[in-house]
Amino acid sequence: MPLSRRELASAPLWLAGCAARRNAVAPPAPVPMSRVRVAPERVIRTIVGLRPFRPSGFVVRGEKLDQKVVIHNYGHGGAGITLSWGTAQLSLAEAAQVETRQAAVIGCGVVGLSTARLLQQRGYSVTIYTKAMPPDTTSNVAGGLWSPVTAYDHERVTPEFRRQFGEAGRFAFRRFQSLVGDGYGVRWLPVYSLSRDSAHQPPPPESANSEIEPLYPDSRQLARTEHCFDVPYVYRRYSMLIEPAVYLNALLRDFLAAKGDLVVREFRDTPDLMSLRETLLFNCTGLGSRELFHDDELIPIRGQFVVPVAAAGDRLHDPRSGRHLHVSAPRWRVVGRQSRARRVRHAGGPGHYGSNPARERGGLRRHANSYNGQGGPLW
């Protein structure tokens, strides 16, 4: 359902890292926001997923294996949706010298689907091979805010990665703008970054994120009279929010409509991949690349989403807090928590993959307490 001007202006969402249209218009005056109604007893569902993180950043490069060329495109961390079109574009550039018009894409998450669609638009005949399809992919439990977050460790960034990161971010920024609308589940929202300690500071010039920061439209620190958050520092920019369930289904629909083939198949190892008939392969397997291609730098990081009961007028947001990055999306009524990278030796084990009730309760309280325009505790 389309948002009214009033709803769009008041829909709060926290997270840095999005590019938005230059002609986005900020609301001329603060709009009253209703209280956030979140509490442990209102939680109806908790979703946990693992993101494929590499401290040195994502991998986009070609490799010759036997008689095949494998183009790797994985390791996006918490920025898979955000960078998907951009790294797909980079991966196609890697394949430009391969003399074939038939390609296999391994993986059917957002990176695999984006890569497959760009291949089709360049005239390739494409088959996706995957062990899981939407709604059962890691991409389906993504937060969906356009934001290059948890994509790399600052200390590990190389000049080449910085070039790729900036190029991928700018391409993806332009591409997502063309998909705004109900059909793809993409829309614009204001983004509020909250702090009790200091005003927003732009990324330092040596940071890879400094390549993305100039894309944000109408970004500025808000005066205390321009918002109703219970914090002294509020920084606003505009971002795109992508609904994974709608978006991934739309990409899959487009792929099949363009006569793409899809085969459900799990690969045990690299030699198993070599049995495919295609000579050009795009590896978009995310965490699967750790086993398939022996990338020991690939680390699973846990993302946890808490879904409270939706209530009319609720608007969710979130501040930065210590070790964890908080995300919230008003359309889902989701309170999310993205933990820092941690090595998971047995991905899926109860100690690593399950939800954390203590974090869930703490996150809910932080949400409620920081959004308190009328004073006093909310619950």
Residue ranges and their predicted role:
Residues 239-310:
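Predominantly flavin-linked oxidoreductase catalytic cores and closely associated redox partners
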Residues 23-66, 75, 81-83, 89, ...:
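Active-site substrate-recognition segment that forms the wall
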Residues 101-109:
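Beta1/beta-strand and adjacent pyrophosphate-binding region of the FAD-binding site
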Residues 1-16:
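N-terminal secretory signal peptides and thylakoid transit peptides that target proteins
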Residues 133-168, 224:
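Glycine-rich active-site loop/strand segments that organize a redox cofactor
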Residues 89-97:
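Internal hydrophobic alpha-helix adjacent to the cofactor/substrate pocket in enzyme cavities
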Residues 11-15, 48-67, 139-141, 171-254:
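Flavin (FAD/FMN) cofactor-binding and adjacent substrate-gating region
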Residues 19-20:
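Bacterial signal peptide processing site
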